[in-house]
Amino acid sequence: MTKSELIERLCAEQTHLSAKEVEDAVKDILEHMASTLESGDRIEIRGFGSFSLHYREPRVGRNPKTGDKVELEGKYVPHFKPGKELRERVNLGS
């Protein structure tokens, strides 16, 4: 599901809200989540999961085109850990 598909679905379910209000709410939520992670904090949504940053150590990679070794710097990457309820729902649906 894309962001625009999410907005469309929410608009269909929340008929008392305008499309602009729904779009603004979704954008605000995503912006707050991004800025929270940017500041190094963790996000926990009970029953859904948590978002945090994981550090990837520096390593030697390879250029897939040439095969040359490339030094890759360490970096932080967003990580999502699903909550118990979400894991159970996904497993029941498969």
UniProtKB/Swiss-Prot annotation:
Concerning SMART domains, the annotation shows: BHL
Q: Which InterPro entries match?
A: Hist_DNA-bd, Histone-like_DNA-bd_CS, IHF-like_DNA-bd_dom_sf, IHF_beta
Q: Can you quote a single GO CC term?
A: cytosol
**A GO molecular function for this record?**
DNA binding
Which UniProt keywords are present, listed alphabetically? DNA recombination, DNA-binding, Transcription, Transcription regulation, Translation regulation
Pfam families, alphabetized:
Bac_DNA_binding (PF00216)
Q: Which family does it belong to?
A: Belongs to the bacterial histone-like protein family.
Q: Which HAMAP family match?
A: IHF_beta
**Role noted for this protein:** This protein is one of the two subunits of integration host factor, a specific DNA-binding protein that functions in genetic recombination as well as in transcriptional and translational control.
Q: Identify this protein by name.
A: Integration host factor subunit beta
Give the source lineage, highest ranks first.
Bacteria, Pseudomonadati, Pseudomonadota, Gammaproteobacteria, Vibrionales
